Amino acid sequence: MGLITARRQALADVWKGYGAFFGVCTGSPGDTTTPANEASYTSGNRVATTWASNSDGTVSGSAVLLNAPAGTYTHGTQCSAATGATQIAWAALSPTIILNAAGQVVLTPQLAVV
């Protein structure tokens, strides 16, 4: 059984309220509120996106720029605050992001309820 589009959109809209802060990790962040393997940002902390609701069961976030050290980043984390044990969700990055020197990682979050 599938959800009608209006119901999918309502669920996506609720989800965006859980957290707007995003970060990156060098491995799986795990299933606790403290993201494991999170980057030690070179300037600042996790960065907030600005969510926009669509009409097809999705929400789209504005791009966030994270100042990160050299490393291989395999996962993104969604949190409810810029710091602390506030992780609510995570996802594998595709493709993996490799920084050979300190630089910026750009994430553009999206969520779809299917």
Predicted regions: what they are:
Residues 1-75, 80-114:
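Small cysteine-rich, disulfide-bonded extracellular modules of the LU/uPAR three-finger superfamily
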